[in-house]
Regions:
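A general boundary/transition motif marking the beginning of the first structured unit of a protein
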Residues: 1-2, 39
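Short hydrophobic helices that act as membrane-entry/anchoring signals
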Residues: 3-18, 75, 79-82
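Soluble catalytic domains of membrane acyltransferases
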Residues: 20-147
């Protein structure tokens, strides 16, 4: 419920800043009953937001660098939006186990950026491992930012 409220509030804010977003080929997105992993290049902090909007009413979890949780208010906000912290310097097994459990046992899907950051072109292998262990599909996504 709170996730839905936050998504609506953020959609209103982004609409007032950037105008109406246009989504194409949303018919390719799996049904609401199926969990999956959305993957895309990570260019801006808007990325997971627009990806979640394109697939509503589906709810998601997101990996986010642990430093984003240092600010208590912002950390609370993104946690309520489905983010969970990842230590990119010393990743633990929970970075893989947590999303696998969520994908298997809840109605939430996962949004991931295989490069791991906005400033990297290297593709990490976590997406394939999580998808294989959770037995879910990987859905590649691309987008153009508002102009």
């Amino acid at each position: 419920m709170f996730y839905t409220y936050l998504r609506g509030l953020v959609m209103l804010i982004l609409w007032s800043i950037n105008g109406n977003a246009h989504y194409h080929n949303t018919d390719k997105i799996p049904s609401r009953d199926e969990n999956y992993i959305l993957v895309a290049p990570h260019r801006t902090w808007w990325d997971p937001v627009y990806m979640a909007f394109a697939t509503k009413p589906k709810q998601f979890i997101f990996m986010a660098k642990k430093e984003l949780f240092n600010n208590r208010i912002f950390g609370w906000w993104i946690r309520m939006c489905g983010a969970f912290p990842i230590d990119r310097e010393k990743p633990s097994a929970s970075a893989i186990k947590y999303p696998i459990n969520v994908l298997k046992k809840s109605d939430r899907s996962l949004i991931m950026f295989p490069s791991g950051s906005r400033h990297s072109n290297d593709v990490k292998g976590g997406v394939a491992l999580i998808a294989k262990m959770a037995k879910v599909r990987i859905m590649p996504v691309t987008y153009n930012l508002p102009s």
